[in-house]
């Protein structure tokens, strides 16, 4: 993993001005115009695919190993960014004052599979508050009889919270922007966002 800046002010911004970062580059099938990747690039891609865990090629062992690796990577990164030494630079004193919010997936099943253990262990390692239980789902059926999960959030939980948003992958960044706006309407202050991976090429950074 390439070294990432721990100074949030130096991170690129999404369309709403929110600073964000990521840990590994994710090569999409269109990356580089071909799909001839190095061993390291395949390893990074596999980490994201296996973490998401919704590929038929992902075994349960692959998924759990990817979750465990992500827990270590993310915990270490958060400790570096929000350590007491860097607190003044980033305007936050300790991780214990921050709340980790993992962006829910489209279904309850995928949300639990990706983020339940992940958020519990990252927060245990860093001392952050875990927002996982502030989200719930109701399930209905559409006109075709297919189940549809609807996300609900406990707005009172987020009042006054300083939030770090996390997603498994950033593509356009739109989902993070929309979710940040929703949290801020509930009274939270979104400090920054980061992801396990970022799809390349992108073309949506402010400086690109």
Q: Positions of the model-derived regions?
A:
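ATP-dependent adenylation/pyrophosphate-handling site
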Residues: 132-140, 186-205
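Short glycine-rich phosphate-binding loop at a beta-alpha junction
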Residues: 92-106
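Active-site-facing substrate-recognition patch
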Residues: 1-95, 135-162, 172, 198-201
